[in-house]
Amino acid sequence: MAAAKIKRNDEVIVLSGKDKGKKGKVKCVFYNKGRVIVTGINLVKKHQKPIPNKNQPGGIIEKEASVDLSNIAIFNPTLNKADRIGFTIQNGKKIRIFKSNGDIVK
């Protein structure tokens, strides 16, 4: 499998789907499935059963569902648009950079 280009806490933008154009932070990455969970993106309603042991009430809750990696791109704040990620080696360490302007991904 290729190197992980999107990581936790990255600022990403949605490229396609019902939330196209929205931005959010990556909460969780499922590398083996090629999917990510982004805060505030792809909200679905889930019918939750009450769990009395944990004092969790039942009802309909909204939560984030996963999004395919192909439908998101990292957000470049200097250019204010979606960008691609490349890798380079600096001081013996492999770091991620934005392809368009060569800035280091923070």
From Swiss-Prot:
- MF terms in GO: rRNA binding; structural constituent of ribosome
Q: Does the keyword RNA-binding apply?
A: yes
Cellular component, GO, one term: cytosol
Here the disulfide bonds are: none
**Per its UniProt record, what InterPro entries does this chain match?**
KOW (IPR005824), Rib_uL2_dom2 (IPR014722), Ribosomal_uL24 (IPR003256), Ribosomal_uL24_CS (IPR005825), Ribosomal_uL24_KOW (IPR041988), Translation_prot_SH3-like_sf (IPR008991)
Q: Which PROSITE patterns match?
A: RIBOSOMAL_L24 (PS01108)
An example Pfam family from this entry, by short name, is: KOW
The UniProt keyword set, sorted, is: Ribonucleoprotein, Ribosomal protein, RNA-binding, rRNA-binding
The alphabetized list of GO BP terms reads: translation
Reply yes or no: does the keyword Electron transport apply.
no
Functional summary from the UniProt entry: One of two assembly initiator proteins, it binds directly to the 5'-end of the 23S rRNA, where it nucleates assembly of the 50S subunit.
Q: How does it assemble?
A: Part of the 50S ribosomal subunit.
Q: Which family does it belong to?
A: Belongs to the universal ribosomal protein uL24 family.
Q: What HAMAP family would the database entry show?
A: Ribosomal_uL24_B
Question: What name goes with this protein?
Answer: Large ribosomal subunit protein uL24
The organism named in the record is Blochmanniella pennsylvanica (strain BPEN)
State the organism's lineage.
Bacteria, Pseudomonadati, Pseudomonadota, Gammaproteobacteria, Enterobacterales
User: What gene name is given for the protein in this entry?
Assistant: rplX
